[in-house]
Amino acid sequence: VMNCASLDRGFGRCQVMRKQSTVLRKYANGTFDRLADAPVNEHGEPLRRFEALEADGISGAGERLEPGDVYINKQIPTNANDNSAVTMLNSAITYKNAPLSYKSPVEGYIDQVLISDTDSDQTLVKSLIRQTRRPELGDKFSSRHGQKGVIGLIVPQADMPFNDQGICPDIIMNPHGFPSRMTVGKMIEL
């Protein structure tokens, strides 16, 4: 049983980190993938889903991402599989958009961005995306002593027990697990 007011104040939050990466390939005919800056509207402002991008086509650290936002604006050549390198030099290379967009339903933040080269001399772009999640029904919690449990009920503070000073607990755990598991350290810690 957890106190809803404690959850509102930030109790039990967790950080979920997700790594996304893409490779900017170089093709046999001399073409290569590239990064493009954000497309703009008639007023010169970037389109809404491209607002997190910087001038190099990659979102910087600390940028906020909402579902559908683009964080790497990658473009690939349309004729990458064409083997005639001579015709590529004479004609203009056309590109099609292949952006990486944020797909999670919960907002996130770019935590880190890393640009490096692979062994095969291709550019690798990695983004580490951080989400802050609030506890909900069914989430599992554990103490340092191995006592684990699942949130079965989130109760408003008015319905929680309190002492003479009006102090309410943040969490109520079932005490029937202590005799069989013999985790005395948890009893001392509480």
Give residue ranges: language-model regions.
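Conduit-forming functional cores of very large proteins
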Residues: 1-190
